[in-house]
Regions:
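Short coil/turn connectors at secondary-structure junctions
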Residues: 24, 55-58, 90-94, 118-120, ...
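Flexible, glycine-rich active-site loops centered on histidine and acidic residues
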Residues: 70-75, 97, 109
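Amphipathic, small/basic residue-rich leader segments at the start of a protein or domain
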Residues: 1-63, 73, 79-90, 94, ...
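A short core secondary-structure module
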Residues: 121, 125-171
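FAD-binding core of FAD-dependent oxidoreductases
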Residues: 60-69, 92-98, 128-140, 157
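Conserved active-site and cofactor/substrate-binding residues in soluble primary-metabolism enzymes
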Residues: 12, 43, 66, 79, ...
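Active-site-adjacent elements of ketosynthase-type condensing enzymes
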Residues: 103-111
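A structural signal for short hydrophobic beta-strand segments in well-ordered beta-sheet cores
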Residues: 113-116
């Protein structure tokens, strides 16, 4: 897939490519018009994706616009939609995914990273691994255990965290 060709491109090239697609209205063919997408039909999206693949075009950075944005569109507050979606489109913010953990791998029911509600913020303690583009990302969306007493398939929350917050580090 096109996303696999992203690893050799420098961040600046990704940003230029994403901007060029966004300027044409082609960055997120599956987004609804109300959030900045073109409102294309399934057939139009298929033709676009096929042509991009046929021409060996680079993929886009999927974590923000393809993975996190749909969650924000469906479950986010109006403030979150206004704050994050335009910056995802513009490429101003880069995102990474924080799911896998040491000892749990991709078994999300075994997430051990803990989040405690502090009223105006969450205090998060734990470690994520295999986090592609963490070294380039401005934000991470992560699955965090927020209810220690809940059964293991429950009590997990989807948190958005600023990678520049104190205590966040990449190795």
């Amino acid at each position: 897939m096109a996303e696999n060709r992203n690893s050799y491109l420098p961040k600046e090239d990704h940003e230029r490519w994403q901007k060029a697609l966004n300027d044409k209205g082609w960055l997120v063919p599956d987004w609804p018009v109300e959030f900045g997408g073109p409102g294309w039909s399934t057939t139009q999206k298929y033709i676009f994706d096929t042509e991009m693949a046929n021409h060996n075009a680079p993929g886009i950075m999927p974590f923000g616009v393809r993975m996190c944005a749909p969650v924000i569109m469906k479950f986010g507050s109006d403030e979150q939609k206004q704050r994050f979606l335009p910056r995802m489109l513009s490429g101003e913010d880069w995102w990474c995914q924080g799911y896998s953990e040491p000892g749990a791998g991709s078994d999300l029911a075994n997430v051990q990273t803990i989040g405690e509600d502090q009223g105006d913020h969450w205090l998060v303690n734990g470690q994520k691994i295999w986090t592609s583009y963490a070294d380039k990302a401005d934000w991470i969306f992560a699955l965090i255990r927020t209810d220690r007493d809940a059964p293991k398939h429950k009590g997990i929350s989807f948190l958005l965290m600023d990678m520049s917050d104190p205590g966040v580090e990449t190795r």
